[in-house]
Design a protein with these regions (language model features):
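Hydrophobic, well-ordered secondary-structure elements that form the walls
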Residues: 341, 387, 440-441
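Long, highly charged low-complexity segments enriched in Glu/Asp and Lys/Arg with interspersed Ser/Thr
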Residues: 444-475
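Extended, regular secondary-structure scaffolds
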Residues: 117-119, 123-244
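Extended, helix-rich architectural segments
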Residues: 1-155, 161, 166, 293, ...
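Short coil/turn segments at secondary-structure boundaries
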Residues: 112-115, 127-128, 268-277, 351-356, ...
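Long, compositionally biased
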Residues: 283, 369-387, 393-394, 463-488
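Extended amphipathic alpha-helical segments with heptad-repeat/coiled-coil character used for oligomerization
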Residues: 385, 398-435
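Extended, charged amphipathic alpha-helical segments
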Residues: 207-367, 407-415
């Protein structure tokens, strides 16, 4: 028996509020908007307003974001290149790929992967468009959440999408396997007229009528049309899904890097300019005998220092300077922390442009690439399953019998970076081993499955044209010599 939609919306809205806060926090970390720690106690910045302002300014300058490359280097390598069915496991299907490209997913899939890698989850909604064909959209993880059946990580119970439209009203859509319920807040968010305690949270919901649609809208497919891409999911089933950002395990290292940079900036502020000292100097004083700081000699690049020694002690006047601070330890500590981030996150060091990768042996670089390829392969298992389910639903929407295929596999591009020569050699080896021509063609960089099939068709056409233009082969048999008459 299906749960009351408003009760279900109330539960899912509360979880979506928690999820939206976590998503916003993860996106801030990725964007470099890191939380600023409070000033240490017993320091002027903890009590004095001006000192606190200076501390906050310096802390914002100290943010040195090393989290972005962890996500970017993975996202750039995750490129779906087609889908295979159990009936044709050696080639990709052009029909489902046409649906994929018609929905601009050859570009927009990057948005879903980026959202999942940054925040732990991304979402895809599939539903018929106005023309009856499958329409696939990428959704913001702050606005969508999926509820799963208890004990399952795959059986979707319901999904919720919430957003504020241009008119200021809150819109909520509940997706279930039987129907789709569309609501709108009774008041605009710009009026502040909310009713606390309602299922929608701080606003009252009322059914939203859409022209030429029944309410609720029947779901003829018997399946929730919202699909979740989860990055690094837990083995424990979660009622509301979700994953873990790629950089979640190295946030402490990022905090340490920011703190190290902060200390370096403070040292630069106070010790980068060489401090000078003077002995035997008759410094100016006030009437009470205290040093006259206003008349003191001030050091500067455009200033000439003129000093008056004590009477009769001219030979004791000395001027010197302290050595400037050594900032190399700060750089070394930062590099050590970044190396720790590489190890913990499985990100190759070259993603951070570390200087110790100069003249790295090819075997060592291959091992670094292997770490990256393993991480990408693990992500592709989770993401690929979601894309396969979404495309199966799209085929169902369009009445394609291939939706009944029990095995739909997402085909990914190469996870390892190879030179064009290496890739061409690999393709030639595959050809020598008897691989189909479409597989050989698709191994060349930048060649999509549809392009590979076009190459195959043109290659066959060229062979036929060449055969037709070739001179005719004379198939007239050689004359048979006469049999000599037998003697006698």
């Amino acid at each position: 028996m299906q749960e009351d939609p408003l009760v279900l919306i109330g539960k899912m809205t509360a979880k979506l509020n928690e999820r939206a806060l976590a998503v916003k926090t993860a996106e801030d970390w990725y964007d470099g908007n890191h939380p600023i720690p409070d000033p240490p106690p017993n320091t002027p910045a903890a009590t004095d307003g001006e000192a606190r302002k200076a501390y906050l300014t310096m802390s914002r300058l100290a943010v040195t974001n090393f989290l972005r490359p962890i996500v970017d280097v993975r996202q750039r390598r995750l490129n779906p290149e087609g889908f295979q069915f159990s009936q044709s496991p050696t080639s990709t299907d052009t029909g489902v790929w046409d649906i994929y490209r018609r929905n601009h997913l050859d570009g927009d899939s990057d948005l879903a992967h980026m959202a999942a890698l940054k925040t732990g989850q991304g979402f895809v909604i599939v539903w018929p468009g106005s023309d009856g064909k499958a329409e696939i959209t990428i959704e913001d993880p702050e606005s969508v959440i999926v509820a799963y059946e208890p004990g399952s990580r795959r059986k979707r119970k319901a999904a919720l999408k919430r957003w504020v439209d241009d008119d200021g009203y809150v819109y909520v859509t509940l997706y279930t396997a039987l129907a789709i319920y569309k609501y709108r807040s009774a008041a605009s968010t710009t009026t502040g007229l909310y009713v606390a305690g309602q299922s929608g949270g701080s606003y009252q919901l009322e059914p939203r009528q859409v022209p030429n649609e029944t309410w609720p809208l029947r779901n003829p497919y018997g399946e929730v049309p919202v699909f979740e891409l989860r990055a690094n999911p837990s083995v424990k089933p979660s009622l509301y899904g979700g994953g873990t950002p790629e950089f979640a395990g190295v946030l402490n290292e990022q905090r340490k890097i920011n703190q190290t940079t902060m200390l370096m900036l403070v040292a630069m502020e106070h010790q980068s300019f060489r401090q000078r000292w003077v002995t035997g100097w008759d410094y100016p004083t006030n009437e009470d005998g205290t040093p006259d700081k206003a008349s003191m000699v001030k050091a500067g690049a455009s200033r000439l220092m003129t000093l008056k020694p004590y009477d009769g002690q001219e030979d004791k006047l000395r001027v010197g300077e302290f050595s400037q601070a050594d900032f190399r330890p700060f750089v070394d500590i930062t590099q050590m922390l970044v190396t720790t981030m590489c190890s913990s996150s499985g990100t190759p060091p070259y993603a951070f442009l570390l200087g110790n990768l100069i003249n790295v042996a090819s075997d060592a670089m291959a091992r670094l690439e292997g770490i990256q390829a393993d991480a990408l392969e693990a992500l592709s298992w989770h993401f690929g399953e979601t894309w396969s389910d979404a495309m199966r639903f799209a085929l169902m929407v369009e009445g394609n019998e291939k939706a009944k295929d029990p095995v739909i596999t997402t085909v990914w591009g190469e996870f390892e970076r190879r030179t064009a020569t290496e890739q061409a050699n690999l393709a030639m080896m595959a050809k020598a081993a008897g691989a189909p021509s479409t597989v050989v063609f698709s191994m060349f960089p930048g060649v999509s499955p549809s392009e590979a099939k076009r190459w195959k068709t043109e290659a066959i056409s060229d062979q036929l044209v060449a055969a037709a233009a070739a001179p005719a082969i004379d198939v007239t048999p050689d004359p048979v010599p006469p049999v000599p008459a037998s003697a006698g």
